[in-house]
């Protein structure tokens, strides 16, 4: 018996923002964005599309795929850094929205690695209690936390949600190995500050917004190296080689990062899933959205070896190897 993914789902906002649209807002152009990021367009949340709403829709799709209903869930764990409220948690709001009355729910903060962290936490619960059904989600509305005048971030970050339901099953398929890592010494390279609560000049009730800060070149260097190390560690532990991998689904951070990672791992372009052109970088939602798209697009079949990997602020990173 092993922990398996029973169903996946995703949800994207309706509004599409193209590179041409961004040319009207910030000093940039379509060619510059495409060549440096691989992004052509992205989805931006509008009214009524908060992180928990997008997540709830993704959750319902995942439950449908798993043949389950919300009342079957025992636990909800959500990776997010852009919930529109600090309290209650995004997970609790999702629990109420979908009607998962018996599930306990909480958030994890691991930035772009949030979904992998959520999956690891959820899988440990399932491993110790095989009857459990756990909903793991990555959801973000980072457009609201991005300085639209900063072309280093405004062209990259976008909104969306992805989900997976996990449980226990007999057989050989399932999560074969997972590894998570963190290094807080790089916290000043990629961060999203809070409400500036340390500013004593603010009077009660006042709020200063915060935006994502990213040193792109440093992030690139560390991201490729970290994800490569995590993936190699898992492949060595399980005893598989690159040619046995059907599909690598990496965090959709930047096309250069994705291509560089694939090359360093010795994978062909056909083995690396890419959808950043359509959705941009959706942080914690990136991997589950890509996973759901790959599943529904028929790119993954029963018995295939699938690798998930991600890297985010903290730094946080990790990888997971799954036999589908």
From Swiss-Prot:
Main localization category: cytoplasm
GO CC annotations, alphabetized: cytoplasm
Keyword flag Kinase: no
Pfam hit, one: ACP_syn_III
Subcellular location: Cytoplasm
UniProt-annotated stretches for the region ACP-binding: 252-256
Gene3D superfamilies: 3.40.47.10
Active site per database record: 112, 251, 281
GO molecular function terms attached to this record: 3-oxoacyl-[acyl-carrier-protein] synthase activity; beta-ketoacyl-acyl-carrier-protein synthase III activity
Keyword entries, A-Z: Acyltransferase, Cytoplasm, Fatty acid biosynthesis, Fatty acid metabolism, Lipid biosynthesis, Lipid metabolism, Multifunctional enzyme, Transferase
Top enzyme category: transferase
Function: Catalyzes the condensation reaction of fatty acid synthesis by the addition to an acyl acceptor of two carbons from malonyl-ACP. Catalyzes the first condensation reaction which initiates fatty acid synthesis and may therefore play a role in governing the total rate of fatty acid production. Possesses both acetoacetyl-ACP synthase and acetyl transacylase activities. Its substrate specificity determines the biosynthesis of branched-chain and/or straight-chain of fatty acids.
Family to which this protein belongs: Belongs to the thiolase-like superfamily. FabH family.
Alphabetized NCBIfam families for the sequence: fabH, PRK09352.1
Free-text note regarding domains: The last Arg residue of the ACP-binding site is essential for the weak association between ACP/AcpP and FabH.
Protein name: Beta-ketoacyl-[acyl-carrier-protein] synthase III
Organism taxonomic ancestry: Bacteria, Pseudomonadati, Thermodesulfobacteriota, Desulfobulbia, Desulfobulbales
């Amino acid at each position: 018996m092993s922990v398996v993914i029973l169903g996946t789902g995703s949800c994207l906002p309706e509004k599409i923002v193209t590179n041409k649209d961004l040319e009207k807002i910030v000093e940039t152009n379509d060619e510059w964005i495409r060549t440096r990021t691989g992004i052509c367009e992205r989805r931006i949340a509008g009214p009524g599309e908060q992180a928990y709403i997008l997540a709830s829709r993704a959750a319902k799709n995942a439950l449908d795929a798993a043949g389950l209903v919300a009342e079957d869930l025992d636990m909800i764990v959500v990776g997010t850094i852009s919930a529109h409220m600090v309290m209650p948690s995004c997970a609790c709001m999702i629990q109420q929205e979908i009607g998962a009355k018996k599930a306990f729910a909480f958030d994890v903060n691991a930035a772009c690695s949030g979904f992998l962290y959520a999956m690891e936490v959820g899988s440990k619960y399932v491993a110790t209690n095989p009857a459990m059904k756990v909903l793991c989600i990555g959801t973000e509305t980072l457009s609201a936390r991005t300085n639209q005048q900063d072309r280093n971030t405004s062209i990259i970050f976008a909104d969306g949600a992805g989900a997976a339901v996990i449980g226990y099953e007999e057989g050989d398929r399932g999560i074969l190995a997972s590894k998570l890592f963190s290094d807080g010494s790089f916290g000043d390279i990629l961060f999203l500050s809070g409400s500036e609560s340390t500013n004593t000049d603010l009077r009660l009730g006042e709020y200063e917004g915060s935006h994502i800060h990213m040193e792109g070149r440093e992030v690139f260097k560390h991201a490729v190296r970290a994800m490569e190390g995590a993936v190699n560690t898992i492949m060595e532990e399980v005893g598989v080689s690159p040619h046995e991998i059907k599909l690598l689904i990496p965090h959709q951070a930047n096309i250069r990062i994705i291509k560089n990672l694939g090359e360093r791992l010795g994978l062909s372009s056909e083995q690396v899933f890419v959808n950043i052109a359509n959705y941009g970088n959706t942080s914690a939602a990136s991997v589950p959205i890509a996973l759901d798209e790959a599943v529904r697009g028929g790119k993954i079949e029963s018995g295939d070896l699938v690798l998930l990997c991600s890297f985010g602020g903290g730094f946080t990173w990790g990888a997971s190897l799954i036999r589908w």
